[in-house]
């Protein structure tokens, strides 16, 4: 119990003593009632939200945070990608009447990805358990039963046959159910591309503070992965909503507000899948009769092998005049009629991630550690330089000309002019700009809405 400070010695008469005792007792009772009420307010009940989940658990503020009036809660998100499985342990704090803030993140990754255990699902449990131990180490014991635990799988499991993928997910679910954390029936799933884009949009706008103030300007999100690419932003022009093709709009509810987002994932237009298409290959199939795939986008003297989606291809460059023009022509063929262009996008501030960042950093367009800003035209300038000097100054990667040309033309197809500024970042306020934060935050928010009408 909090100690009431003594501000001086009280000299009480026999008559005043009973009165003083009553006053003291009244203060004590009032304090106890206040303490219990504060503790009750610090609880937030998470009720089962989706897919028949059944639970009613309670989370509460740690003593230090409760003293500041902040509600503390945690969330655990597993990112099951194609090359590895990563755990993110997030700690949030919510001041009274305000939106939550991220106060701490713990991250750990293990290789290989879950898909590597497709033929022996039992072996997948060891890595999952190891990562769960990380969560136990960084989340106070009293919070375990109220901390949501979720796994979202991306490209790696999407490429597996359905039966194998489901067996892996079922094994993960068994391990999760045996853990001390809060687990619903929807605790493991394979993300679709749009969900990935929306979750990344939440992450960026949460970290930049755009979600905290109603009516504040939000930022758009561009993500270029290996198999797909996503674009997500919040339209302010009614014409954008009316002209959007089916499947390009999605509703997001956060903080008791509904956002109608323009969001679409282009499967097959991720950088690795685009490489294969530019080379003339077919996804998931070896070249006919082991034919060598030749492209003007590769270094003229290059000849070698390239593996994609567990298929190995023989590839080589070709000698020709005007390699950039030939490469750009081929890339344009691959992109033709594949991307929907919206006029409003050029007027929205965008962050770009993943391979956009990696390529820009590799060729000195931004600082490799800190990130930075560039204009879309910088990718075209870099592409022309690299492609036109392939023969005299071969780059370290034989795909440099192809990749830069592809990114340049992809951004053009999205409707961005050459002078459009993009912000490239791996971290915002020292937090990874991945979809994981947005996904767990949205999950927790949706659970809370089932019990509490306002955050």
From Swiss-Prot:
Q: Would you say which domain of life the source belongs to? A: Eukaryota
List required co-factors. Answer: Mg(2+); Ca(2+)
After translation, the protein is modified as follows: N-glycosylated.
Q: Where are the transmembrane segments?
A: 13-32
The entry's active site is 196 (proton acceptor)
Supply the EC number(s). Answer: 3.6.1.6
Q: How is the cofactor bound?
A: Strongly and equally activated by either Ca(2+) or Mg(2+).
Q: Which residues lie on this side of the membrane: Cytoplasmic?
A: 1-12
Instruction: Tell me the protein family, please.
Output: Belongs to the GDA1/CD39 NTPase family.
This protein is called Ectonucleoside triphosphate diphosphohydrolase 6
Q: Which organism is it from?
A: Mus musculus (Mouse)
């Amino acid at each position: 119990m909090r100690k009431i400070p003594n501000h001086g010695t009280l000299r009480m008469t026999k008559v005043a003593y009973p009165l003083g005792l009553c006053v003291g007792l009244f203060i004590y009772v009032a304090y106890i009632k206040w303490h219990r009420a504060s503790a009750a307010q610090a609880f937030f009940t998470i009720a089962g939200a989706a897919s028949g989940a059944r639970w009613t658990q309670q989370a509460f503020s740690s003593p230090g945070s409760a003293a500041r009036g902040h509600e503390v809660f945690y969330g655990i998100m597993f990112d099951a990608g194609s090359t590895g499985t990563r755990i993110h342990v997030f700690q949030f704090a919510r001041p009274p009447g305000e939106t939550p803030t991220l106060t701490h993140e713990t991250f750990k990754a293990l290789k290989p990805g879950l898909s590597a255990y497709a033929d022996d699902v039992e072996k997948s449990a060891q890595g999952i358990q190891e990562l769960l131990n990380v969560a136990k180490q960084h989340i106070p014991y009293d919070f375990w039963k109220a901390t949501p635990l979720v796994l979202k799988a991306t490209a790696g499991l999407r490429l597996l046959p359905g039966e194998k993928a489901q067996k892996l997910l079922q094994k993960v679910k068994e391990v999760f159910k045996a853990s001390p954390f809060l687990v619903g029936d929807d605790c493991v799933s394979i993300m679709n591309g749009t969900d990935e884009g929306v979750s990344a949009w939440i992450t960026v706008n949460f970290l930049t503070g755009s979600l905290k103030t109603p009516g504040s300007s939000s930022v758009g999100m561009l993500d270029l992965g290996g198999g797909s690419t996503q674009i997500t932003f919040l339209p302010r022009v009614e014409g954008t909503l009316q002209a959007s093709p089916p499947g390009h709009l999605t509703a997001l509810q956060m903080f008791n507000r509904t956002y109608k987002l323009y969001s679409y994932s282009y499967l097959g237009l991720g950088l690795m899948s685009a490489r294969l298409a530019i080379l003339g290959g077919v996804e998931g199939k070896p070249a006919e009769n082991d034919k060598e795939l030749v492209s003007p986008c590769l270094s003229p003297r290059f000849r070698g092998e390239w593996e994609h989606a567990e298929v190995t291809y023989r590839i080589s460059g070709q000698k020709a005049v005007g390699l950039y023009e030939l490469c750009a022509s081929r890339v344009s063929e691959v992109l033709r009629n594949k991307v929907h262009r919206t006029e409003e996008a050029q007027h929205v501030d965008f962050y770009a991630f993943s391979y956009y960042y990696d390529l820009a950093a590799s060729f000195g367009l931004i600082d490799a550690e800190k990130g930075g800003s560039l204009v879309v035209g910088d990718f075209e300038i870099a592409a022309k330089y690299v492609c036109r000097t392939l023969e005299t100054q071969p780059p370290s990667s034989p795909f440099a000309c192809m990749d830069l040309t592809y990114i340049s033309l992809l951004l053009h197809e999205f409707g961005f002019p050459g002078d459009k500024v993009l912000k490239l970042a791996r971290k915002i306020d020292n937090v990874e700009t991945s979809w994981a934060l947005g996904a767990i935050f949205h999950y927790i928010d949706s659970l809370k809405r089932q019990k509490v009408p306002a955050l």
